[in-house]
């Protein structure tokens, strides 16, 4: 069949019986041929690709393996408890127990230096200066005597209450600043004591009884 006749038969220009397609059977043959070929490959695959038996590779033990084996042998050894050796140095004798274990207690046990008493053996109230200020302007004199380390008795009887209160406030601040003491011994009579002077209650009573005669 010529190509022209095939073309006419394809588009319905000639009867279909006259059209002989040489390719009708070829697709079936083409489909069957790969199937047979595939079956052959399957047989060859089953026959040729057999899983080989892998043999265990042999290698020389490394340094780490030897160390691990050494640790295993160490763990299997019997354990021996060691007794700590006693020191040849003699033990220190314990110190006598005090009131506590703090360092504050040790310092507290030290003897404190007592401040010199106001009244000494040379004479009663020999170290005291008695001042009877008339106004607040005399506060400077009181401060200078107290700063020099001399106990000062302030007799404020002749002052007004307002000025006396101002002078008492000044003396109290002065004693606090110089770490001294400020005590009342009688009505409107006060004692300023420096830091190194210790005034007891008995001495304050004696100061009040003497009438503050030791004036300077």
From Swiss-Prot:
Provide ranges: composition bias, Basic and acidic residues: 28-50, 62-80, 106-118
* Entry superkingdom: Bacteria
> Where's it found, cell-wise?
Cytoplasm
Q: Which GO terms describe its cellular component?
A: cytoplasm
Keywords (A to Z) from UniProt: Cell cycle, Cell division, Cytoplasm, Septation
Query: Which Pfam families does the protein's record reference?
Result: SepF (PF04472)
Region annotation Disordered: where it falls in the sequence:
22-126
Q: Where is the signal peptide?
A: none
Biological processes, Gene Ontology terms:
division septum assembly; FtsZ-dependent cytokinesis
- Record keywords: Cytoplasm included? yes
InterPro entries per UniProt:
Cell_div_SepF, Cell_div_SepF/SepF-rel, SepF-like_sf
> What's the family?
Belongs to the SepF family.
Biological function: Cell division protein that is part of the divisome complex and is recruited early to the Z-ring. Probably stimulates Z-ring formation, perhaps through the cross-linking of FtsZ protofilaments. Its function overlaps with FtsA.
Under the subunit heading, UniProt states: Homodimer. Interacts with FtsZ.
Q: What is this protein called?
A: Cell division protein SepF
Native source species: Rhodococcus erythropolis (strain PR4 / NBRC 100887)
Name the gene behind this protein. Answer: sepF
């Amino acid at each position: 069949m010529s190509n022209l006749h095939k073309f006419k038969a394809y588009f319905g220009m000639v009867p279909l019986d006259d059209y002989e397609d040489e390719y009708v059977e070829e697709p079936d043959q083409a489909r069957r041929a790969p199937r047979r070929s595939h079956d052959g490959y399957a047989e060859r695959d089953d026959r040729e690709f057999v899983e080989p038996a892998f043999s265990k590779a042999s290698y020389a033990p490394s340094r780490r393996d030897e160390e691990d084996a050494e640790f295993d042998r160490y763990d299997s050894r019997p354990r021996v408890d060691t007794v700590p050796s006693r020191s040849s140095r003699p033990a220190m004798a314990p110190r006598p127990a005090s009131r506590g274990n703090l360092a504050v207690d040790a310092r507290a046990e030290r003897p404190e230096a007592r401040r010199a008493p106001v009244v000494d053996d040379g004479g009663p109230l020999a170290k005291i200066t008695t001042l009877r200020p008339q106004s607040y302007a005399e506060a400077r004199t009181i401060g200078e005597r107290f700063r020099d380390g001399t106990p000062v008795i302030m007799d404020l009887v002749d002052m007004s209450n307002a000025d006396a209160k101002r002078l008492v406030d000044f003396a109290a601040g002065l004693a606090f600043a110089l770490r001294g003491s400020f005590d009342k011994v009688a009505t409107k009579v006060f004692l300023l004591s420096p830091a190194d002077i210790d005034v007891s209650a008995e001495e304050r009573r004696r100061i009040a009884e003497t009438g503050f005669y030791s004036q300077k």
